[in-house]
Every structure is written in structure tokens, then in C-alpha cells.
Swiss-Prot record:
It holds the Pfam family LpxD. This is UDP-3-O-acylglucosamine N-acyltransferase 1. Keywords: Acyltransferase, Lipid A biosynthesis, Lipid biosynthesis, Lipid metabolism, Repeat, Transferase. It catalyses: a UDP-3-O-[(3R)-3-hydroxyacyl]-alpha-D-glucosamine + a (3R)-hydroxyacyl-[ACP] = a UDP-2-N,3-O-bis[(3R)-3-hydroxyacyl]-alpha-D-glucosamine + holo-[ACP] + H(+).
Amino acid sequence: MQYTLKQISEHLNAKVINEPSGEVIITGLNYAEQAKENDLTLIDKQEHIKLWQNSKAAAAIVSKKISKELAQVNDKPLIVVNNADLAMAKILELFSVPYPEQNGIHEKAVIDPTAKIGKNVSIGPGAYIGKNVEIGDNTIIYANVCIYNDAKVGTNCIIWPSVTIRDRTIIDHFCRLYSNCSIGSDGFGYRPSEDGRTIVRIPHIGNVVIGSFVDIGSNTCINNAKYGSTIIGDYTKIDNLVQIGHNVIIGKGCMICGQAGISGSVTIGDGVIIAGNAGIKDHTNIGSDARIGGKAGVMWDVPAGESHMGYPAYKDSELAKQWIAIRKLPETMKKLKAIAKSLNIDL
């Protein structure tokens, strides 16, 4: 797979500076420090300029704000764009390896006769499609996927091997579910018995509702609602190994990073980012455009637009004061002991 520099710049509708007289062939994409002679790289930050100086890459996609400075480093061609990261995403699509070819319904797929299968749907070997399931047009279902009774999957979805979609789940259009994720398992609902000697299981009779253009990473679990629905909004992206409890409501355009845990009945607004390994206490509310730092432990509501981090999580500006105070604590104790000694007081 290869493209000329001209084809790439035209695909981005972008200007080239240090444009060469001859044709430049691009055969791959890589980081500046790892790039080979026919690779295209990305330079989008001031601190990456030094990497470009020593890079073997044939050309770079660069942010407009640093393009003039970068053009003086050497005479290699630069494709200038407003947002280099988003531009590179478009080029990554050009170089993406096609999905494994799968046409039609495999003879070893098990499909209940009551299921409704749309046009141009592909279903791989070992897949199970239960009673009254609906699959939209152009959806690809790979090997060993299980979709249980009364579930609905929209159009143009891609469901990778060994995904489990439980009863009554509703998934809208253009979603991607990666291998081994589990959608609609019972929530962790248990209560001590009246005598306190055993644990009583609470049935979960609701469902999971997933909007359009949602990505769900490998080994992520989204639990069924006790009643009502666990809801994931349009365009939300969920990493691998994320746990989402029963009756959680997540808004549109959120990003949830790996190993985050969201307890039952949490409500999350639109555009929220939750970093890796963060934990959210049950029945809390996270406002739209909030940011939750890595390994944060959120114990109470987070207002819209605020950044919270640490354990327990506080607003970033408040937590910074705590960190400064802790760093000063040894010196403060030293001074306090000196004062106590001068006053003949034991600490």
C-alpha cells in the first residue's frame, strides 16, 4: 500500500511547504524517531521539533502553529494542517488493513428462525443468534458471537469474535464491539438476607441501550439494569477492561479509559473524559465536560466542566494545594519541633 505525497495532501486539502520537485512515495506511517525513509510522520508539538531534526521520515504532517519553525530545520516536505492529530487519523484510514473478509452467513452459525436478518449481513462460524433478534443491514458478526433473545443490533455495526450480547439489549447504528466484551450481564445486585446469614440475589429485568457510533473495547462489561435501562450515549468511546454497573447513564461523546470502574446508578453528562483506573462511587453525578484523572476515586458529585483527581477525588486546584502542603510537611514539622523544644514542650 502506497500513496504519493501529492495524493495525501489532496486528501487532506492541505498545503505543502518545502515541496519537492520530484514525486515522493509514502509507504507507511510511524513516529518520527522510528520512521524509515519512505514513512510519513506527525509533528504537532514544540517538543517534537528536535525529533524531526534527526528523523529519517520522508515527510511530516505538521500543525500550522509550528510549521514555519519546522520548515527551517531541514528541507523535507511538510503537509500543513490546523490539527495534525485529526489529519493523521484520516491518513491512518487510508493505510488501514481491510477487515477480515467475511461474506454471507456461515453454515456453522446457529440462527433462530424467528430472527430478522437485514441485507448484506455477514455472520461467522459458531455465532449464535437467538429468538426475535434483529440485525440491521451491512452489519458484520464474527465467529463465536452470541446474541440472545429479543436483542436488536442496528446497521453497519462490527462485532468482533466472542462478544456476548444478552437479552433485550438495543444497539444502534455504526457501533464497534471488540472481542470478548460483555453487554447486558446481570448487575452486581445482592443484599444480606433478613437473618444476615446468607446473601440474596436481586434479579435484573431491565436492559442495556447503546447509541450510534459507540466503540466498546475488549473485555469491557456493561451490566444490565435492575429495571429501566443502562444507557450509553452516541459517539461515546470505551476502552478495554472497563466495568460499567447497572443503571448507569453515560451521555454523548464521552471517553472512558482502560480499567475505569463505574458503579451502579452513576449519571455522566456529555463530553466527559474518565482516565484509566479511575473509580466512580454509586449514585454520583458527573457533569458534562468534566475530567476525571487517572486512578481517581470519585466519592461525590463532580460539577460540569471541572477536573477532579486523586483519592478521594478533589477539584484539581484544591488537590494541588494539598500536594504542596504535604511536600512542605517535613520542613514544617522540623520547624515545629524546634519551636516546641525552645518552649520545653514534647511533641
